[in-house]
Regions:
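Secondary-structure boundary/capping positions in well-ordered alpha/beta enzyme cores
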Residues: 80-81, 138, 167, 190, ...
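Glycine-rich phosphate-binding "P-loop"
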Residues: 143-144, 166, 277-278
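Catalytic alpha/beta core domains of metabolic enzymes, predominantly
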Residues: 133-134, 147-254
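Helix N-cap/beta->alpha junction signal
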Residues: 90, 197-198, 284
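A general structural signal for well-ordered alpha-helical segments in protein cores
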Residues: 34, 66, 70, 94, ...
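Active-site beta->alpha loop and helix N-cap motifs at the rims of alpha/beta catalytic domains
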Residues: 3-149, 159
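C-terminal alpha-helical cap/extension of soluble enzyme domains
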Residues: 2-5, 11-20, 40, 44-46, ...
């Protein structure tokens, strides 16, 4: 293996954290805390951050909050290190949000497949093309059928990749490694295929993926970075060893609905986090104690 491996020079880098949005106890956004968290994550080794994604509680933040948060994070780390989440099931609405986010100067847009209204593949194709046209900057698709019900089929991903120049990659969280391999085999080498599941990072890399948009990197940036760095340096055994060490962290961080465990872990580290917004709920005392014990045992705190 060498630096010529597909994905080694991914547009946004190999490790991005889907950043949690710090909140005050009353549920309002802690913008200063978000800046502090973003700076800390970047200093730890992230290549870029996804802001206003699912981990950032995008379903329960308003457009105004999303845009204000982008302003704060851009001020903290620079627009070129920010990928803005802009996804939903109302194409016209998301086109406006994507355009407004792009106008902030961010590096790219991450847009999830439309959920609930269960469009056919032609509808998904047209949805993403409309968003990409509206944004007019690099766009990543986000396929997470466990949340959206709608899978972006390989043929649809291929079609968008070939027809829409500024759709430059996808975040695949389908859990279907055959689909991931098919996407890699049917798209140009410049099309970046990110893992959207922390527990599938190494399999993604093995079939030609470029890295990960991670959640556990809030508490394990060096560990996730090591997997990518070793893989692209040609050290497959080292990458495997590093990856296997992350699996317990993944299980713990996803033991309850995300991002509640992530926010609890950040609080244990003394980082800005705060509560989650309903309908999500924070960890209860026993869950928090289990998380603290695990993090202590693993040397994370």
């Amino acid at each position: 293996m060498s630096a010529t491996l597909r994905g080694a020079n991914a547009r946004f880098g190999n490790l991005l954290t889907a950043m949690a949005t710090p909140l005050y106890p009353d549920g309002s956004i802690d913008f200063a805390g978000a800046q502090t968290l973003a700076k800390w994550l970047m200093a730890g080794g992230n290549d870029a951050l996804v802001i206003n994604g699912t981990t950032g509680e995008s379903p329960t933040t308003s457009d105004d909050e999303k845009l204000d948060l982008l302003d704060a994070i851009i001020e903290a780390i620079g627009a070129d290190k920010v990928v803005a989440g802009a996804g939903g099931n109302d194409t016209r609405h998301i086109c406006k949000l994507a355009a407004a986010s792009a106008a902030k100067g961010v590096a790219g847009i991450l847009s999830v497949a439309p959920y609930y209204n269960k469009p056919c593949q032609e509808g998904i194709y047209r949805h993403f093309r409309a968003i990409a046209d509206a944004a007019a900057i690099p766009v990543l698709l986000y396929n997470v059928p466990g949340r959206t019900i709608a899978n972006i089929d390989t043929a649809t991903t291929e079609r968008i990749a070939l027809d829409q120049e500024n759709v430059i990659g996808t975040k695949e969280a389908s859990g279907n490694m055959m689909q991931v391999a098919d996407i890699v085999s049917r798209t140009p080498d410049t099309f970046d295929v990110y893992s959207g599941d922390d527990g599938t990072l190494l399999p993604h890399l093995a079939v030609g993926g470029c890295g990960i948009i991670s959640v556990i990197s809030h508490v394990a940036t060096p560990q996730m970075k090591a997997v990518c760095t070793k893989w692209f340096a040609g050290d497959a055994a080292g990458a495997r060893e590093a990856f296997l060490l992350t699996l317990g962290i993944t299980r713990m961080i996803f033991a309850q609905p995300s991002p509640a465990p992530t926010k609890a872990a950040l609080s244990l580290l003394g980082k800005p986090a705060g509560p989650v917004r309903l309908p999500l709920v924070d960890l209860n005392q026993s869950q928090l104690e289990a998380l603290a014990a695990f993090m202590t045992e693993r040397g994370l705190i």
